[in-house]
Amino acid sequence: MRVLGIDPGYAIVGWGVVDYAGNRFAPVDFGAVCTDAGVPFERRLDEVYTGVKEVIERTKPEVLAIEKLFYQHNQTTVIGVAEARGVILLAAAQAGLPIYEYTPMQVKLAVTGYGKAVKKQVQEMTRILLKLPAIPKPDDTADALAMAITFCHTNGNQLNRFTVRSVGPI
């Protein structure tokens, strides 16, 4: 199965495409769509949409795994990311891709086995699982690859699409 993972944003959209078969990962391609801060916001959204659409057309994924939006303290940032996420979801929907959303905790758990792992641990485990010589840069790209790995590890267990289980005392 070919999976496109995306770490949404409006300045940088990390993306990573992974093939997964027989419990083995093979990185296909990865990178980032970057927009210029000096450009009007609607133009940046167009660049995000066009960039993601091009990645989908070129790499032909079967599914999209994307980070679920969570509340941030800076409302301006969260609104901008939500709008960028909207054009990303539009590109995926137009391509007929099923869309799966994951929280940061689900990604940490799926990639490292620990839901409270730090970013560096997730990135290093992503590098190891994909047999890459170095952690991909920018960080958004590594995060997108981790998103694709999360789909692969949770595919088949539909409950993981909807819930985050916490481990701890009851």
Locate each region found by the language model.
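Phosphate- and other anionic-substrate recognition elements at nucleic-acid/protein interfaces
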Residues: 1-170
